Amino acid sequence: MILPVQNPRMKVGVISDIHGNKVALDAVLEDMPPVERLLCAGDVVGYNPWHAECVEFVRERDVPTVMGNHDRAVAGHSSFGFNSMAAAGVEHAREQLDDDQKAWLGALPVCHTACAGRVRLAHGHPTDPNRYTYPAEFEPGLLDDEDVLVLGHTHVQGHEVFEEGIVVNPGSVGQPRDGDPRAAYAVLDLDTMSVEPRRVSYDVAAVQEAIREAGLPEKLASRLEDGR
């Protein structure tokens, strides 16, 4: 439940790497405790078949969102090297989205500050959106003036709390890769400066069926049950 409150001392829901998985996104939103803001660290589209529905969710609710590498590719201006599975998801998204939706993806910022400057969003790394920054690499030097840096891209949930602030990856809503197939997200408490990583089960079989019906690669379906 997202409450209509703007307050720098608040609870904030953080999501990333939805990747067109509306079934998982719906499960996350149903599971999420009351928060006063929702933030997204990019890659709204790709891999799974509900690209338009996921774009419209974040767009209609004006969820602060940064551009992920799949978002950039679908918008048509990316040199990021994709494997065949990722490329198939990008092409499917390009076919499913209208020009206005693709333009919206292409206009997303690379970095964004929210919550009165207390939270900064970046997809892969603060200086390189294509760089993978795994939780083992989290260190205070990643932080600038913000209290919390939110990253995505790796699909691996994790966070570290330092004297200087917090670095957190909420994990992937739509395609987890940390061995847990449940959809991942996190809740930040900017009052206590704490992170609650959360997981929620969703109907993986229904998503697998939709992936196959869309003609996407089989591996995109099978990997969901393993969380890899």
Predicted feature residues:
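Conserved hydrophobic/aromatic beta-strand scaffold that supports enzyme active sites
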Residues: 111-113, 121, 159, 185-187
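Acidic, His/Gly-rich catalytic cores of divalent-metal-dependent hydrolytic chemistry
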Residues: 161-228
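Active-site-proximal segments of metal-dependent phosphoesterases and phosphodiesterases across multiple
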Residues: 7, 80-88, 115-144, 176
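Haloarchaeal acidic low-complexity proteome signature biased toward cell-envelope/secretome components but also
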Residues: 1-10, 19
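Core catalytic region of metal-dependent phosphoesterases/phosphodiesterases
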Residues: 11-102, 106
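Hydrophobic/aromatic beta-strand patches that form the interior of the parallel beta-sheet core
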Residues: 39, 64-66, 122, 150, ...
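Active-site environment of divalent metal-dependent phosphoester hydrolases
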Residues: 19-24, 46-49, 70-76, 113, ...
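Active-site-proximal beta-strand elements of phosphoester/diester hydrolases
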Residues: 11-17, 118-125, 167-171
